[in-house]
Amino acid sequence: MKVTLCVVGRLRAGPERDLINDYLQRFDRTGRGLGLGPASVVEVEDRKGGGKAAEADLLRKAVPRGAVICALDERGKTMSSPQFADSLAGWRDAGRSDLAFLIGGADGLDKALRAQAEARLSFGAMVWPHMLARVMLAEQLYRAAAILAGTPYHRV
């Protein structure tokens, strides 16, 4: 199951980008034998200032056809890392070939786009800068693959 991070904004070179790349490479290596991956990032940018609706249109175009859509949103469901791993495995086992995670810009995701998503995921009640949300998602993808592979990365 391919995983696409569809995100608003461009991340410059720096520690956040390095962390994302590192965790996604780890996810690809660990997930390959599990039917997970590869992972990619599609960055979209509304240069015309059309707000959340314009960002939503760009994000919709970035989502692979037929993909499970999971929106990251503070109103979404919080879950443990093992629950997240089970969700990934469930979509994979249901024969879904693509999974797209949506991360909005500074104002979040458009309401209609959130409603379109099959799943909504929250990293807690706090609001996170989108660059940190990207890092956290990349790490949780790797952690989920490690849990499913039975490696010692996830310790409780």
Swiss-Prot record:
Keywords: Cytoplasm, Methyltransferase, rRNA processing, S-adenosyl-L-methionine, Transferase. It catalyses: pseudouridine(1915) in 23S rRNA + S-adenosyl-L-methionine = N(3)-methylpseudouridine(1915) in 23S rRNA + S-adenosyl-L-homocysteine + H(+). Its EC number is 2.1.1.177. GO terms for molecular function: rRNA (pseudouridine-N3-)-methyltransferase activity. One of its GO terms (cellular component) is cytoplasm. Pfam families: SPOUT_MTase (PF02590). Its main location: cytoplasm. S-adenosyl-L-methionine binds at L72, G104, F123, G124, A125, M126, V127, W128. Transmembrane segments: none annotated. It is found in: Cytoplasm. It comes from the Bacteria. Homodimer. Specifically methylates the pseudouridine at position 1915 (m3Psi1915) in 23S rRNA. Belongs to the RNA methyltransferase RlmH family. This is Ribosomal RNA large subunit methyltransferase H. It comes from Dinoroseobacter shibae (strain DSM 16493 / NCIMB 14021 / DFL 12).
